[in-house]
């Protein structure tokens, strides 16, 4: 399975693994599955750190670089196709990060791993719920 981690699932998997369901934790640990990330997740992690909502040591930039060089994530590029799909996809809200992640899942044929109930109500893409 190709799993696209949303921001909270990424952070929980590394900082608070107890917040993951058994099913999600098992899926993330399964070597048969591919773990994918979007650049918008990197951006959102850095924004959360800048706002003081999370603490990443020694600093957010070093932390994120270390994560991406030690864990074999695949990059789901933010390209024109994803940008267009983010406006076409049927979601109940306009949050741009959620729209980019949902569109990325559709464009690349990925399963979005999320706890976001607003996203989990959509049938527009494949999702693995963390609830």
Describe the function of each predicted region.
Residues 1-37, 51-66, 70, 108, ...:
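Short, well-structured N-terminal submotif of metal-dependent ribonuclease cores
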Residues 45:
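Phosphate/NTP-binding elements of NTP-utilizing enzymes
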Residues 87, 123, 127:
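Phosphate-binding/catalytic loops
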């Amino acid at each position: 399975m190709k799993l696209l981690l949303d921001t909270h699932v990424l952070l929980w998997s590394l900082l608070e693994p107890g917040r993951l369901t058994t099913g999600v934790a098992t899926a993330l640990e399964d070597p048969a599955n591919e773990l994918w990330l979007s650049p918008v997740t990197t951006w959102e992690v850095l924004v959360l750190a800048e706002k003081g909502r999370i603490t990443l040591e020694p600093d957010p930039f070093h932390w994120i670089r270390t994560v991406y060089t030690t864990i074999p994530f695949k990059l789901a590029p933010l390209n024109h196709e994803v940008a267009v799909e983010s406006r076409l996809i049927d979601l109940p809200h306009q949050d741009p990060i959620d729209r980019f992640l949902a569109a990325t899942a559709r464009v690349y044929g990925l399963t979005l791993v999320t706890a976001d109930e607003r996203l989990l109500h959509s049938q527009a893409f494949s999702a693995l719920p963390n609830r």
